[in-house]
From Swiss-Prot:
Official protein name in the record: Dihydroxy-acid dehydratase
Disulphide-bridged cysteine pairs: none
UniProt organism field: Corynebacterium glutamicum (strain ATCC 13032 / DSM 20300 / JCM 1318 / BCRC 11384 / CCUG 27702 / LMG 3730 / NBRC 12168 / NCIMB 10025 / NRRL B-2784 / 534)
Cofactor: binding details: Binds 1 [2Fe-2S] cluster per subunit. This cluster acts as a Lewis acid cofactor.
Catalytic residues, chain numbering: 519
Length: 613
């Protein structure tokens, strides 16, 4: 038997002071000696994906208590990337991932909690908690707040926007064809309920990946935040984590720990899922970071290999009119994993917090398996309510029938894949010797080869300016540098530049490359995570206006057509300059907190984690 971590504060004479304090929190005499389960919540009124989580912790706590554990809740911070987008607030988004991970470690280790239920949802909160879980390696179950419903259709100047979401609103704001009244109509429809934004953006991508990693329950990534069916996920999470405690502490079963579940094979399965569902490019950052925290030998080269073999089986907003509610109707993540499994594209030697093997997991939960349980079938009938609300569990609507069309439906089989390559591709070349990433699911294949002159800017703000003032021309490659983890600092998302290119009619006529990153809502020929970044001496810092940049997605190449000799001449000049590898004319306030992150941050190919050794 493995002693409970909390025993040092709950058992023996030396723990009298700690027990006195535990009693002051409401702990009962008969609870001392039981596993203390940290309910790691992230409720906030700042973020629609978290606004409904205030009372959810109580649901989990009740389930933990009934199962024999002692629940204790605390909260982490949560940044809304959409509200922080396009101004200095975005500098804080990626660094907040590290703050969240650290805060979870601080609370859990300071109070010797035995296990965790992580109630996350939005962009950096799930990754931050995932990093903490892999770092701490104690029993954990993830249960997110769930996706937002898609907005209802609106018609603006005869053009249908159906259904709507956050990206619809941002793109419409940059379109000359949309007047103020039309923009107001789109805005009012775009985000109708609580939950993580309704497309396959970063938040939903990461919540889906926790299913594939084996750390959350089936349906976690796709069951709507507003649906009553989601209550059972919270209850089951509380029950399950106590069972994991029993197996680890009582039976010394280390296979139930995060590092026993999220093995290299599980990480490979998660990235195979990511490729198949056309997930956000941010997932690569976060998966690489989580692997490092868990000491899993999984890097960008592994992702590159997977992307060559795994087809894209689903295109969801911003790459189609499908949204998470449609993914759910098609069977959610178990259906996607089922198609990958039938295609021989998954490692079978994996398990999860809820199942001892992959085959049993998919038999029970994949609606196309022919063996699906009634519970699973009922779950995937959960449909949107269509009513504006910030309340969880506010609808019990059901789809009349499920989407099982493997040829033309939301989730396709391997035979009917959108593309043979995965929805995410790693590009290398003299601009990105350590790698860059493109969401190939977001662009038509005829755009996979693009060559044009560079238009160089040194901040996201400058990029927005050249787009909105119509300075950039069709056929050009917009190069946005010094926006990497160190150079930004904070590796801003380029959602506004990509949305404004789309709204200006240049979404298919220009390319954008950056050492920054992209929102999960970005689309078009957008290449991010260029490594090394400019601030670390990357070639992206040497590109000049007019240099010819070539992009070849098929052959995974990203090159600037400048000789090695000329690049070396430019490098020598840069090194001899007064402020080498820094933006020349950028006016940006960088606080001490951000400077601290910048000094420790690695480039994107390492997950933009902090290097502290």
């Amino acid at each position: 038997m493995i002693p409970l971590r909390s025993k040092v504060t709950t058992v023996g004479r030396n723990a009298a002071g700690a027990r006195a304090l535990w009693r002051a929190t409401g702990t009962k005499e008969n609870e001392f000696g039981k596993p203390i389960v940290a309910i790691v919540n992230s409720y906030t009124q700042f973020v629609p994906g978290h606004v409904h989580l205030k009372n959810v912790g109580d649901i989990v706590a009740d389930a933990v208590r009934k199962a024999g554990g002692v629940p204790k809740e605390f909260n982490t911070i949560a940044v809304d990337d959409g509200i922080a987008m396009g101004h200095g607030g975005m500098l804080y988004s990626l660094p907040s991932r590290e703050i969240i991970a650290d805060s979870v470690e601080y609370m859990v280790n300071a109070h010797t909690a035995d296990a965790m239920v992580c109630i996350s949802n939005c962009d950096k909160i799930t990754p931050g908690m995932l990093n903490a879980a892999m770092r701490l390696n104690i029993p954990v179950v993830f249960v997110s707040g769930g996706p937002m419903e898609a907005g209802k259709a609106v018609v603006v100047d005869g053009v249908a926007h159906a259904p709507t979401d956050l990206i619809t609103a941002i793109s419409a704001s940059a379109s000359d064809a949309v007047d103020d009244a039309g923009l107001a109509a789109v805005e009012a429809s775009a985000c109708p309920t609580c939950g993580s934004c309704s497309g396959m953006f970063t938040a939903n991508s990461m919540n889906c990946l926790t299913e594939a990693l084996g750390l959350s329950l089936p349906g976690n990534g796709s069951t709507l935040a507003t649906h009553a069916a989601r209550r059972a996920l919270f209850e089951k999470a509380g029950e399950t984590v106590v069972e994991l405690c029993r197996r680890y502490y009582g039976e010394e079963d280390e296979s139930v720990l995060p590092r026993g579940i999220a093995t290299k094979k599980a990480f490979e399965n998660a990235m195979a899922l990511d490729m198949a569902m056309g997930g956000s490019t941010n997932t690569i950052l976060h998966i690489l970071a989580a692997a490092q925290e868990g000491e899993v030998d999984f890097d960008l080269a592994d992702i590159d290999e997977l992307s060559k073999n795994v087809p894209c089986l689903s295109k969801v907003a911003p790459n189609s009119d499908y949204h998470m509610e449609d993914v759910h109707r098609a069977g959610g993540i178990p259906a996607l994993l089922g198609e990958l499994n039938r295609g021989g594209l998954l490692n079978k030697d994996v398990h999860s917090v809820h199942s001892n093997d992959l085959e049993g997991w998919l038999d029970d939960w994949d609606i196309r398996s022919g063996k699906t349980t009634e519970v699973a079938t009922e779950l995937f009938h959960a449909a949107p309510g269509g009513i504006r609300t910030t309340e969880a569990f506010s609808t019990e609507n059901r789809w009349d029938e499920l989407d099982t069309d493997a040829a033309k439906g939301c989730i396709r089989d391997v035979e009917h894949a959108y593309t043979a390559d995965g929805g995410l591709v790693v590009l290398r070349g003299n601009i990105s010797p350590d790698g860059a990433v493109i969401k190939s699911a977001g662009i038509e294949e005829e755009l996979w080869n693009f060559t044009g002159p560079a238009r160089v800017v040194e901040s996201q703000e400058e990029a927005v300016s050249v787009i909105l003032t119509k300075t950039i021309q069709a056929g050009e490659v917009l190069v946005v540098r010094y926006e990497g983890p160190s150079g930004g600092p904070g590796m801003q998302e380029m959602l506004h530049p990509t949305a404004f290119l789309k709204g200006s009619g240049l979404g298919k006529k220009c390319a954008l490359i950056t050492d920054g990153r992209f929102s999960g809502g970005s689309s078009g020929l957008s290449i991010g995570h260029v490594s090394p970044e400019a601030a670390h001496g990357g070639v992206i810092g040497l590109i000049e206006n007019g240099d010819i940049v070539s992009i070849d997605v098929h052959n995974r190449k990203l090159e600037v057509q400048v000789s090695d000799e000329e690049l070396q001449r430019r490098r020598d000049a840069m090194n001899a300059s007064e402020k080498p590898w820094q933006p020349v004319n950028r006016n940006r306030v960088v606080t001490k907190a951000l400077r601290a992150y910048a000094k420790m941050a690695t480039s994107a190919d390492k997950g933009a984690v902090r290097q502290v050794d």
